[in-house]
Curated annotation (Swiss-Prot):
Lineage: Bacteria, Pseudomonadati, Pseudomonadota, Betaproteobacteria, Burkholderiales
Main location as per UniProt: membrane
A single GO cellular-component term on record: plasma membrane
InterPro entries found in the cross-reference section: DUF1328
Membrane-spanning intervals of the chain: 5-25, 30-50
Subcellular location: Cell membrane
Recorded family membership: Belongs to the UPF0391 family.
The protein, known as: UPF0391 membrane protein Rfer_1875
Disulphide linkage map: none
Keyword presence, Kinase: no
Keywords for the protein's UniProt record, in alphabetical order: Cell membrane, Membrane, Transmembrane, Transmembrane helix
Topology versus the membrane: Multi-pass membrane protein
Keyword Transmembrane helix: yes
Amino acid sequence: MLHYAVVFFVIALIAALFGFGGIAASAVSIGKILFIVFAILAVASFLFGLIKKR
């Protein structure tokens, strides 16, 4: 459990550096594009799973 706490603390520090450093503003557009791509892939995977069961 302590291992997970340390890992999430390090991730939070890295996110804070990006957020306070101004890098986050330029990464927003990349994040939006990646969200759309992975949402489409998730829906496609779900549909292919339903089709394959039949």
